[in-house]
């Protein structure tokens, strides 16, 4: 079974993820990104999709033109887990050239 993060674990892990915010009413985190154009946004999503498939852990996301909104939560645990934190760190690295959220 996948271990859901405790409140203290969640707080500690999120200190290292300053671009992520809590989703109101859910045990989930969200990040909004904006890229130069659709090609950059889609390229970013492709890199994340490959990693997510390797992890067997898939984000909820929404894309319009150059904007990508991502929500992470582990459905099997009904909340945040280490898998979400690992994927968030990968996303941060992949999005290093992105502009602040839209």
UniProtKB/Swiss-Prot annotation:
GO biological process, one term: tetrahydrobiopterin biosynthetic process
Keywords: Lyase
Annotated catalysed reactions: (4aS,6R)-4a-hydroxy-L-erythro-5,6,7,8-tetrahydrobiopterin = (6R)-L-erythro-6,7-dihydrobiopterin + H2O
Principal EC category: lyase
InterPro entries: PCD_sf, Pterin_deHydtase
EC code: 4.2.1.96
Xref: Pfam families: Pterin_4a (PF01329)
GO molecular function, one term: 4-alpha-hydroxytetrahydrobiopterin dehydratase activity
Keyword Lyase part of the UniProt annotation: yes
Origin: domain of life: Bacteria
Family affiliation: Belongs to the pterin-4-alpha-carbinolamine dehydratase family.
Record-given protein name: Putative pterin-4-alpha-carbinolamine dehydratase
High-level lineage: Bacteria, Pseudomonadati, Pseudomonadota, Betaproteobacteria, Burkholderiales
């Amino acid at each position: 079974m996948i271990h859901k993060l405790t409140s203290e674990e969640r707080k500690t892990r999120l200190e290292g993820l300053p671009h992520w915010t809590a989703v109101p009413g859910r045990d989930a985190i969200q990040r909004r990104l904006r890229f130069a154009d659709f090609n950059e946004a889609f390229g970013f999503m492709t890199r994340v999709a490959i990693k997510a498939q390797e992890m067997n852990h898939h984000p909820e996301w929404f894309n319009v033109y150059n904007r990508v909104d991502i929500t992470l939560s582990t459905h099997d645990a009904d909340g945040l887990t280490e898998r979400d934190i690992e994927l968030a760190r990968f996303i941060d690295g992949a999005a290093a050239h992105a502009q602040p959220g839209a």
